């Protein structure tokens, strides 16, 4: 775990050297933005992992897959929320998760501009800056705060009706940025977070951070995991209600 935490922390501090500086932006084939900070942060994390775990596979957003087929696979998102990063919004994150034979067993999400580190390891709980944290104990959906990434994306991915049901049934729907919303659920500051499109490198750390905090992370149908191309973080108490609202 120490290698993971140090790599994520140091990569995050590296990104702060570019944050708020008007760093140049390029665009990938899918029109998503990338900066030199994304590239250098991933290179730093990769170098640490390769030195410590030479037999492990690595899946990174910027540099692809190495040692495909390895039983141990690290997922790196060097800057989750690049669009926020390039505009000086402090809610971006550096994400890292380890999957062993299909199960995420440890993960970390570091928010450099906030200096918040959320991490978990299987059987050891979830921690925020070293303090144990748990999901909220809310049992009434009508009092729940539910975060989301982009409201329009629910329509684009055929989830518009489900999203409208969630809006009607819940107390408040703040549009928290990307990984930060999932971290807010794990640390007891939000009851649920919905993301209708999510890659494995975006999701990986939350596959262990949420369960170890007493919550759920998985798809909108109740299947835990990081490979569904969508993601929901929610407290265990409110999971049945959220699944009912999201039912197609």
Regions inferred by a protein language model and the residue ranges of each:
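An extended, acidic
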Residues: 134-248
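N-terminal subdomain of lithium-sensitive/metallo-dependent phosphomonoesterases centered on the IMPase/IPPase/PAP
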Residues: 1-79
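Acidic active-site catalytic centers that drive phospho-/nucleotidyl reactions
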Residues: 38, 42, 61-62, 77-80, ...
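DPxDG-like acidic metal-binding loop motif
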Residues: 68-127, 144
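Residue-level signal for inorganic ion chemistry
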Residues: 15, 38, 49, 82, ...
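Short loop segments at secondary-structure junctions
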Residues: 99-103, 113, 122-125, 131, ...
């Amino acid at each position: 775990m120490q290698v993971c935490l140090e790599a994520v922390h140091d990569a995050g501090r590296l990104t702060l050297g570019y944050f708020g500086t008007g760093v140049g932006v390029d665009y990938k084939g899918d029109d998503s933005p990338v900066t030199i900070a994304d590239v250098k942060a991933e290179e730093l994390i990769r170098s640490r992992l390769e030195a410590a775990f030479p037999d492990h596979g690595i899946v990174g957003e910027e540099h692809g897959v190495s040692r495909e087929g390895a039983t141990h696979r690290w997922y790196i998102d060097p800057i989750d929320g690049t669009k926020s990063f390039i505009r000086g919004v402090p809610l971006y994150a550096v994400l890292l998760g380890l999957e062993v034979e299909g199960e995420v067993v440890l993960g970390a999400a570091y928010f450099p501009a906030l200096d918040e580190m959320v991490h978990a390891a299987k059987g050891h709980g979830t921690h925020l800056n070293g303090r144990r944290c748990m999901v909220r104990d809310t049992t009434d959906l009508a009092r729940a705060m539910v975060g989301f990434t982009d409201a329009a994306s629910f329509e684009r991915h055929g989830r518009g009706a489900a999203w409208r049901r969630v809006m009607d049934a819940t107390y408040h729907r703040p549009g928290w940025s990307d990984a930060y919303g999932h971290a807010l659920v794990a640390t007891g500051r939000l009851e649920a977070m919905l993301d209708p499109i999510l890659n494995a490198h975006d999701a990986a750390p939350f596959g262990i951070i949420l369960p170890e905090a007493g919550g759920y992370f998985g798809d909108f149908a109740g299947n835990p995991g990081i490979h569904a191309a969508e993601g929901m973080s929610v407290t265990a108490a409110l999971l049945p209600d959220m699944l009912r609202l999201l039912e197609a």
